[in-house]
Amino acid sequence: MISIENLSKSYGSKVVLENINLNFENGKVYGIVGENGAGKTTLFKCIAGLEKHNGAIICEYGKPKDFLGYLQTEPFFFSKITGNEYIQLLCNARNVTNTDIKEKNIFDLPLNEYAVKYSTGMRKKLAFTAILLQENKLFILDEPFNGVDIHSNIIITEIIYKLKEMGKSIIISSHIFSTLNDTCDEIFLLKNGQIIKSVLKEEFSNLEREMKAFTIGNKIEKLNLK
């Protein structure tokens, strides 16, 4: 269980997040949706301890960063580190010993090659594998399906189901509504740095229609397509 209370974040005079209040329970999957620039990634970085902020983040396990697996949109890799070394490095950081990484290479990645030579999708799969093997209790997945092939999307989705079954908390951001509909128990709509709506699974279709309405409006008509 993790609770966010009155979390706010500003860069100078620009307010990015304002009075965010959220509760994430164990064994549930949550979606965060919003336009580009709405503050999703900033919120994730605040939870992960990568950004200073006002407000409180309260967790039953202690500091979130000590048990959090954070899959960033564009994971960072050192230039001279192989895929295998990257996984080992992240596991060592949590005092987790994994001697059979080869057996757990579910995405069939070339682990002996430098990670910086990987494609965007391969990098994301490598980073995802690493945080899975860290034995985390909370997972934040920022656009986990972007740039990843359909086969891997299926695997990622099934892993999310498994993590939920194990009692983990999972927070996902995605612009792919069908995926959120398949995986999430609750979705929060973030707009201009504020949570303006939360909906349970049975109401997802209504949220999708609302988002289309305020996102598209009459923009397509303005094109006057012929």
Describe the function of each predicted region.
Residues 48:
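Helix-to-loop junction immediately C-terminal to a conserved catalytic motif
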Residues 2, 17-19:
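Conserved structural motif at the start of ABC-family nucleotide-binding domains
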Residues 33-35:
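The feature captures the beta-strand-to-loop junction immediately N-terminal to the Walker
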Residues 128:
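Hydrophobic anchor residue at the start of the ABC signature
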Residues 150-151:
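Helix N-cap at the start of a conserved alpha-helix in ABC-type nucleotide-binding domains
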Residues 174-175:
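H-loop/switch region of ABC-family ATPase nucleotide-binding domains
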Residues 139-143:
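Catalytic Walker B motif of ABC-type/P-loop ATPase nucleotide-binding domains
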